[in-house]
Amino acid sequence: MIKLRDELGTATTDSAQKILLLGSGELGKEIAIEAQRLGVEVVAVDRYANAPAMQVAHRSYVGNMMDKDFLWSVVEREKPDAIIPEIEAINLDALFEFEKDGYFVVPNARATWIAMHRERLRETLVKEAKVPTSRYMYATTLDELYEACEKIGYPCHTKAIMSSSGKGSYFVKGPEDIPKAWEEAKTKARGSAEKIIVEEHIDFDVEVTELAVRHFDENGEIVTTFPKPVGHYQIDGDYHASWQPAEISEKAEREVYRIAKRITDVLGGLGIFGVEMFVKGDKVWANEVSPRPHDTGMVTLASHPPGFSEFALHLRAVLGLPIPGEWVDGYRLFPMLIPAATHVIKAKVSGYSPRFRGLVKALSVPNATVRLFGKPEAYVGRRLGIALAWDKDVEVAKRKAEMVAHMIELRTRSSDWHDQNYEKRKHLLR
């Protein structure tokens, strides 16, 4: 692992520090931009050409990241200082091999291996971190799934052991939903579909992400710094809107920090962790963990001071650079600049060369802006951008972000224009 760093070189020279992004979506793009600001050389990898991060990288490679030989060919050629996974669809054996060969995998190969597999993650949360979670059981047959759902109780959630963004998951309201849940898990799983996890439904007040970052302090000691919890809601298992700070009690906020600290201490390494939790009153349950910047954390592009978004914090940690913070009641906290919110801009249709309109109206709204990711292809439900808004009142920011997002229309080469108003579930402005 790298140590506290006081020097940086210059990109494309023999003094350069170099990062290799495995995954080049919108989150990787922001990491790449922050790296460019510090003169760090950026190499981006993804399964398709001209992915967002590739557009701001020094070099890029296109290939199957589940192919270990392909990954090794890139790593041996580039010899990066840090290998930064941005997605889950990566050959895990390769990550362990890179580490064994002396490369720095962020935060470490084991954390990535645990986080992408729900059984490994749940057992780590409960048995190693010893944090509260919803009740859960596993099923490997349809009969076992019926039995597990009965024991957990209705409603409950079924999820493929390996999946993301809501794929392979089902909200089971009663026994009549179980065949559909079984089919969803079996057909939408990533990798093995042998086992399904059944989780108790928590009737939470708000779902939050704690963007805990493990990094070196100015004395060279690894510490964990906690930004304010980010509130968010999902539609069909995928992030749709987020805001910071989440509206939770002071007691719940301290519990969020406590749980995130226990989890990240167990996972180890350096970098930011998106720790997802449910909050109801003063009670908090751990849910999932992403050992990388989190999509809900894009709100920090507005809510944090310039140069300190979740992407900048991640990069600082990865490079061995310090992050400022203030100790309050035993936790090292990162100060927020202003309450802010995001709302997604999604495609309703599929096709190439997306175009956007409504920008004159959207970009005329005070204290708001739009980020378009530059993805060359749209498909139904794909996130192509976000609206960002900020205000001293987080509720105002939430409504403004939603309003601005819904001002944007988009089309592709093969489709007509469509707006964002086809989706109204959970929205504030109906």
From Swiss-Prot:
What reaction gets catalysed by this protein?
Answer: N(1)-(5-phospho-beta-D-ribosyl)glycinamide + formate + ATP = N(2)-formyl-N(1)-(5-phospho-beta-D-ribosyl)glycinamide + ADP + phosphate + H(+)
- Say if the entry is tagged with keyword Mitochondrion: no
EC nos: 6.3.1.21
GO BP terms: 'de novo' IMP biosynthetic process
Keywords per UniProt: ATP-binding, Ligase, Magnesium, Metal-binding, Nucleotide-binding, Purine biosynthesis
**InterPro entries the record matches:** ATP-grasp, ATP-grasp_carboxylate-amine, ATP_grasp_subdomain_1, PreATP-grasp_dom_sf, PurT, PurT/PurK_preATP-grasp, PurT_C, Rudment_hybrid_motif
Q: Where on the tree of life does the source sit, at the highest rank? A: Archaea
The pathway is: Purine metabolism; IMP biosynthesis via de novo pathway; N(2)-formyl-N(1)-(5-phospho-D-ribosyl)glycinamide from N(1)-(5-phospho-D-ribosyl)glycinamide (formate route): step 1/1
Where on this chain does N(1)-(5-phospho-beta-D-ribosyl)glycinamide bind?
Answer: E26, L27, E86, D295, K375, R382, R383
Which Gene3D superfamilies does the protein's record reference? Answer: 3.40.50.20, ATP-grasp fold, A domain (3.30.1490.20), ATP-grasp fold, B domain (3.30.470.20)
What positions does the entry give for Mg(2+) binding? E276, E288
Asked whether the keyword Magnesium is assigned, the reply is yes
Task: Name the positions where ATP binds.
Answer: R118, K159, E199, E200, H201, I202, E207
Specify the ATP-grasp domain's residue ranges.
Answer: 123-319
Q: Which GO terms describe its cellular component?
A: cytosol
Q: Enumerate the Pfam families for this protein.
A: ATP-grasp, PurT_C, RS_preATP-grasp-like
Kindly list any coiled-coil regions of this protein.
none
Q: Could you tell me one molecular function GO term of this UniProt entry?
A: ATP binding
The record's annotation in PANTHER family points to:
FORMATE-DEPENDENT PHOSPHORIBOSYLGLYCINAMIDE FORMYLTRANSFERASE
Which family does the record claim for this protein?
Belongs to the PurK/PurT family.
Record text on subunit structure and interactions: Homodimer.
**Function summary:** Involved in the de novo purine biosynthesis. Catalyzes the transfer of formate to 5-phospho-ribosyl-glycinamide (GAR), producing 5-phospho-ribosyl-N-formylglycinamide (FGAR). Formate is provided by PurU via hydrolysis of 10-formyl-tetrahydrofolate.
The protein, known as: Formate-dependent phosphoribosylglycinamide formyltransferase
